[in-house]
């Protein structure tokens, strides 16, 4: 899948005002090491403390009304799960998140607190992913 500049502009317009504007600063050490100007964006200042909510909100916002009513299923062991759960709840979209066995309790709990139904199952990411695909087919 290729991403074009127009895709980025469309995503920006779709999520603008619905996620935090976060600052960025020049990373002196990384700039010195690479010989290029490197900047770091502080996405940890988002509500879920991760840039992942940008992509989650972009995708959820693009769903049709019928798709929204059916809900979404995602697989993640952490930050993406929280981004999907948080924005799905804000948009009134039912969300089920499959998290692999061994996912830290804090990630599971935060995802539930954001309003998602959480299923903890599957050995590793591949096992949880297979389960999520199976659930999506139903």
Segments and roles (model prediction):
Residues 1-138:
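PLP-dependent amino-acid enzyme catalytic core
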